[in-house]
Amino acid sequence: MARLKDRYRQEVAPALKERFGIDNPMRVPTLEKIVVNMGVGEAAQDSRKLDGAMEDLARITGQKPQVRRARKSIAGFKIREGMPVGARVTLRGERMWEFLDRLISVALPRVRDFRGVSPDSFDGRGNYALGVREQLIFPEISYDAVDSVRGLDIAIVTTAETDEEARELLRLLGMPFRPN
């Protein structure tokens, strides 16, 4: 079982239950899924860029990415409807817990000048979004094997009903929030 999932069951869930006065154990906030997205705008001109991004994403998450296509044509960006413009992976279950553990304990501390993640990136419904400037912070990515440095978006979807519950859940799981 994932180390973080164990910690959730042993320490985090009971603490959340007590803090928010939750009686029903099924109402305790937990992680639902983590969506990792990599937008590759250059893929419109060069399809090899998308292959590199998909390879990186597969290495980081341990799961095959899904190609995301443009929903509509935008002449200014030279994009036609249906052109591949990015890659996405939805993580659930064990892989989700393993990924979050690696993100918190290995990847984020490797970010240059890291002072913590923004405590304001909640969406009002208990979900957290985080942007990473370069994929090189993940230990699975070797600096020499990368064709270009790309950023990625990470959306952490929780069952929490409020931002306060979600913030407390992530804080107890070890998410390093920047002090306000």
Swiss-Prot record:
Family, according to the entry, reads as follows: Belongs to the universal ribosomal protein uL5 family.
InterPro entries in the record: Ribosomal_uL5, Ribosomal_uL5_bac-type, Ribosomal_uL5_C, Ribosomal_uL5_dom_sf, Ribosomal_uL5_N
Query: What biological function has been recorded for the protein in this entry?
Result: This is one of the proteins that bind and probably mediate the attachment of the 5S RNA into the large ribosomal subunit, where it forms part of the central protuberance. In the 70S ribosome it contacts protein S13 of the 30S subunit (bridge B1b), connecting the 2 subunits; this bridge is implicated in subunit movement. Contacts the P site tRNA; the 5S rRNA and some of its associated proteins might help stabilize positioning of ribosome-bound tRNAs.
Source organism per entry reads Rubrobacter xylanophilus (strain DSM 9941 / JCM 11954 / NBRC 16129 / PRD-1)
Query: What are the GO BP annotations of this UniProt entry?
Result: translation
- What keywords does the record list, in alphabetical order? Ribonucleoprotein, Ribosomal protein, RNA-binding, rRNA-binding, tRNA-binding
Gene Ontology MF annotations? rRNA binding; structural constituent of ribosome; tRNA binding
Q: Which HAMAP family match?
A: Ribosomal_uL5_B (MF_01333_B)
Keyword Transmembrane helix annotated: no
Assembly and oligomerization: Part of the 50S ribosomal subunit; part of the 5S rRNA/L5/L18/L25 subcomplex. Contacts the 5S rRNA and the P site tRNA. Forms a bridge to the 30S subunit in the 70S ribosome.
> Which GO CC terms are listed, alphabetically?
ribonucleoprotein complex; ribosome
Please identify the protein, giving its name as recorded: Large ribosomal subunit protein uL5
Pfam families with a match to the protein in the record: Ribosomal_L5, Ribosomal_L5_C
